[in-house]
Amino acid sequence: MPLRKYKPITAGTRWRIGNAYTEITTNKPEKSLLESTKSTAGRNVQGRRSMRYMGGGHKKMYRLVDFKRDKKDIPAVVASIEYDPHRTAFIALLNYVDGEKRYIIAPQGLKVGQKIISAEKVEIEIGNAAPLGTLPIGANVHNIELTLGRGGQLARSAGSFAIITGRDGEYTIVDVYKRQPHILCR
């Protein structure tokens, strides 16, 4: 991910480093995978202001992201890598061979035109999805399910990942940064 260093015009920008956004494609988002969201503007369900200084901002459309990756053994091609206003990570638009389109969280190093797949036994490449039990010890993983079939819940934000540190019977021991030292997953 290319980084942009800001000019030290003020004290706040002296050591500021941000994303250069050069990896993002200029395609418009897929309309079938968009939903409108209503801004709460700091109001609760009764309409009363419960959070001060909230409101305004740019209108956002929610992108429906596939956290389950349950389309097994069907290859897909990365059509574009896009910005998502609701999360820190970029998202990738996948075009499956059967014609379906889905968004996933884009791991670092994913390129447009790359072929990826979700399967039980799969090559270890960036973007492929597999059960934790089939991956080798020491592999970096992201978008981890805590409960089978519930979808990814761990290591979903930009730059976050977990490391497979061992196995204990049918469980896999995963080390997540800044969390419990080890989390057991199937």
Explain the meaning of each model-derived region.
Residues D84-A92, K101-I104:
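Short, flexible active-site-proximal loops enriched in glycine and acidic residues
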Residues N95-R102, E120-I126:
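Short, structured beta-strand/loop micro-motifs enriched in basic residues and often containing a Trp
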Residues M1-R87, Q108-R186:
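Basic, glycine/proline-rich low-complexity segments that contact nucleic acids
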Residues A92-Y96, T172-D175:
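SH3/SH3-like beta-barrel fold
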Residues G99-K111:
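Beta-strand/loop nucleic-acid-binding surfaces
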